[in-house]
Regions:
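Extended interaction regions within the primary functional domain
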Residues: 1, 12, 160-164
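OB-fold and OB-like single-stranded nucleic-acid-recognition modules
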Residues: 17-178
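Sec-dependent signal peptide recognition
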Residues: 1-7
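Hydrophobic h-region of N-terminal signal peptides that target proteins for export
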Residues: 8-17
């Protein structure tokens, strides 16, 4: 009986253990990573109105001055169905009746999709989180855990090459940074 109780306690602890962090660059195939590392820095400080990423009609358009890697939808097939934990920033898309965000893009840097340019599609994850999360500050980083899917998603803000049904979403704490 003791051994059974110990095994159950051990399994319960393992079930609650956090997944190791997945790096955003792991979502890109090696050739995209290399192209991204070789391109010049992009300013994320300009307002969208001054950007070449939006046409006069307000719709997204590609900037011909940027390399193709900035629009890459190439994915890493081995990640399809894999349980991951990604750290990133939310871009809210839908909320429930209480104002909690239930659908959002998770992006690797703050201000993405709000200040341009948006990340490449293979650097955006559409997160479904039916439990909802109160987002008081979209510039505060989150940890999102769940099964990653290779899934092409498009809306007026951006295109994503991945989606996730999150099982846990939480704010990054000071202890996480130690």
């Amino acid at each position: 009986m003791r051994h059974l109780l110990f095994a159950l306690l051990l399994l319960a602890g393992l079930a609650r253990a956090e997944l190791p962090e997945t790096d955003w660059l792991d979502l890109m195939p090696p050739e995209d990573r290399q192209a991204l590392e070789e391109m010049p820095d992009i300013s994320h400080d300009s307002p969208e109105g001054n950007s070449l990423f939006y046409g006069t009609n307000g719709l997204r358009q590609q900037n011909p001055d940027l390399p193709a890697v900035m629009y890459s939808s190439k994915t890493v097939p081995e990640l399809d169905g894999k349980a991951v934990r990604l750290g990133g920033y939310p871009v809210p898309l839908e909320s429930d009746a209480q104002g909690n965000s239930t659908l959002f893009f998770l992006v690797p840097y703050p201000g993405a999709c709000i200040h341009v340019p948006p990340p490449p599609p293979n650097q955006l994850v559409l997160v479904h989180y039916p439990s909802g999360l109160r987002l008081d500050d979209i510039y505060a980083p989150l940890w999102v855990s769940g099964k990653l899917r290779v899934e092409s998603v498009s809306n007026e803000l951006a295109d994503a090459a991945y989606a996730m049904d999150a099982r846990e979403v939480r704010a990054v704490t000071d202890e996480d940074l130690d």
